[in-house]
From Swiss-Prot:
Mg(2+) 1 binds at E414, E421. One of its GO terms (molecular function) is tRNA binding. This is Lysine--tRNA ligase. Belongs to the class-II aminoacyl-tRNA synthetase family. It comes from Neisseria meningitidis serogroup A / serotype 4A (strain DSM 15465 / Z2491). Binds 3 Mg(2+) ions per subunit.
Amino acid sequence: MSEQNHPQTEPQLDENQIIALRREKLHNIRQQRNAYPNDFKRDSFAADLHAQYGEIGKEELDPQGIPVKVAGRMMLKRQMGKASFATIQDVSGQIQLYLNNKGVSQEVLDDFNHWDLGDIVGAEGTLFKTNHGELTVRVSGIRLLSKSLRPLPDKHKGLSDQETKYRQRYVDLIANEESRNTFIKRSQIIQSVRNFMVGEHYLEVETPMMHPIPGGATAKPFVTHHNALDIPLYLRIAPELYLKRLVVGGLERVFEINRSFRNEGMSVRHNPEFTMIEFYEAFSDYERMMQMAEDIIRNASHTVNGTANITYNGKEVDLESPFERLTILEAIKKYNPHYTDEQLNDAEWLKKEIVKHGESLPPSPGIGSLQLALFEGCAEGKLWNPTFIVDYPVEVSPLARASDTKQGLTERFELFVVGRELANGYSELNDPEDQAERFKAQVAQKDAGDDEAMHYDADYIRAMEFGLPPTGGCGIGIDRLVMLLTDSQTIRDVILFPQMRPE
């Protein structure tokens, strides 16, 4: 189908000429009537009509003369003698329209033949099946509801330029069914997570997006200024410390799904603003949090894919089986069996090996930090099926509870799937004096040049001094979860309007 039978054929024109021609058409419409009417009332969606009537045979359907009113964007159009066909697209799918001079006046047909692909129309008529069995609306009335002044991408090539996809998401959503389905699935994933949390008796809350002190994660914040108070404020890098204040206050199970902001680099896995869920449960620990994370992810996969055995980038991922658990050193040795325990506890050897794997040396020189940096360089990217890495060093876990049995380690985990981090959680540190000392250590790191080290949060210490129950907490990156469950290779494919360099 094409517009080649139109009175003037757009494919022979460049984009500026097409826009000029369409503006002229709009000007002519304005001379005759309201060019943007708002009184057409749709009563049917394309997908609902196909679901209800798609399997009914022509002989049974046609005599019923079922009346419908449909509306959408015109995606295809062709003329066959005195009759015209068009396909319109609404949020649910597409349906075909059929017009001839028996159903509408010649004047309406003439108007219709001057309309363009991309125009938004409303049509009413009755359902029938073509000789080829396609469900179609026999049009008795049709109106132009909104003129498209810019041409759509070629229907065969689609919107292939990645930069344009992200900058002009509105065009991408029109042209690419795959993109539409990804964002529909994103909504379903978030809803499944929310429903799961409510089913576990968690209370959804909202905490501040602007913080007087950045905290809850080691990251570089965005800074703004509050004019009335004449103070700097920081877009939140994580909601953690506010959510734990609520646990102190007696809200024993809380969660928040919202945006966080980090003033850092962009990549296929990173966007400066991103969505995450954080949840906290009193009288719980990191074992419970690992099970919660596992159940949330598995449930979301079943919701949108009907299975927890999925494919990512052409390779199978098993979300159904219990997730593997390894320590940092176990993971390193799993993929590098030639490393010895002596080497993995030798700071100078670790530094050389970290550089060899292309990683930067951590600001903190402790053995734990060096082991973590080596893990990131030689093992993290190989963790394909879901794997919890557990028992992180104290020096890289300033908010996590120290292990009672493992010297220098904490009850902390990170979850990795398809070679990247998806979740982070721990048994929360609830000793206010220990927390104060760790904040001081973070301040010392910041003074030594670590921009991502935490600030000292005196109010959070004050809250802890009222008594924080034993608590487990976890954060899951929603964007990365959507990437995983929709087989999307870059975070920009799952964020409607990702951050881009100015045009």
